Amino acid sequence: MKFSFEKNYALVQKLKKLKNRYKEIKIILSDPFSAKKQKNFFLLSKEYSKLNILNKYLKSLESINNTIESTKTMLLDPEMHDLAKNEINIYKNKKKLIEKKIILYLIPNEDEYICNCFIEIRSGTGGKEASLFVRDLCRMYIKYSEIKNWKTDIINYSNSEHGGYKEVIIKICNKNAYNKLKFESGGHRVQRIPETESQGRIHTSTCTIAVMPEMLDFKLPKIKTSDLRIDTFRSSGAGGQHINTTDSAIRITHIPTNIVVECQDERSQHKNKSKAMLVLKSRLQANLLKNKKQKEEIIRKSLLGSGDRSDRIRTYNFPQGRITDHRINLTIYKIDEVMDGNLNILINPILEKYELEKIKEILK
């Protein structure tokens, strides 16, 4: 994350203000009589603990700067020049690490997003090719999860008559899953030559992705039974001898919002219902969070797009081996590597850009 400390006046003033606040709280808490009179003693103690971390970073940064300046005087000595130059480089690297810690400290905590996530992939325009691309994207996210040793579970899928999927929902289990994958939401466009294309013409197809956090039970919205319509039907997926013999698949409709969720992955109707309810609650929660996080949405939309399904975020051009992320004008020529799960080369740059934008927002 590239961010200049010394040249950014707003950042210097922000850190100065926080340092003064730390000193102010320290004086209050050090006086037992004054501290007891404070109605918000607990909150002050909590704020002090947090600011104490920043204070340690700032002290380390000051110490490193002093060491660098004192070592620079040794550069004038021919015998000590190389040694001094090496020492300065070592401390400059340490300085970068401390500065990054300070930047991360300033970014608002998103504890509510430390959770598993659901990735919902739907075919768009392009017919057969779009369905095949849904399958390819599903495989890409599963491969990515395998590389990171994250557990995955296919919650629901709808087969296409031409092969691939019309729609698939994957659950990715890891506390960092949502924060890492949240910017995958949006429109994904693929350009490639279909196997059945005899004249070598490139076809363009689209898929849309929605990434939703799986919230803890106590954070999930309460759903009235009267607001639900639950239908059962026979599974069309893999199920061995039980396939199409029992109505084990579940379709849940949330009547007030008209959100519909299906699950047919399990043989058990009860398990399918539980999975479908999880997805439904996560969709409802995602809508609530979107409304509450207006400030974050402004940053997200201005920098990274709205995350809406209609908002094209990425193009995969197979003939050229190219992937372009339109939100940050990033182009790489490693399409096979990405489709095999190395998504970090696309994910990390956009997360860094997002963090930088949040810092700029804080300093306004």
From Swiss-Prot:
Modified how: Methylated by PrmC. Methylation increases the termination efficiency of RF1.
Residue positions of the PTM N5-methylglutamine?
241
Q: Where in the cell is it found?
A: Cytoplasm
SMART domains, from UniProt?
A: PCRF
Where primarily located?
cytoplasm
Which GO molecular function annotation, any one, does this entry have? translation release factor activity, codon specific
Give the record's GO CC terms: cytoplasm
| Keyword tags | Cytoplasm, Methylation, Protein biosynthesis
Cited NCBIfam families: prfA, PRK00591.1
- What function does this protein fulfil? Peptide chain release factor 1 directs the termination of translation in response to the peptide chain termination codons UAG and UAA.
The Swiss-Prot or TrEMBL record describes its family as follows:
Belongs to the prokaryotic/mitochondrial release factor family.
What is this protein's record name?
Peptide chain release factor 1
State the organism named in the record: Wigglesworthia glossinidia brevipalpis
Taxonomic classification: Bacteria, Pseudomonadati, Pseudomonadota, Gammaproteobacteria, Enterobacterales
Q: Please state the gene responsible for encoding this protein.
A: prfA
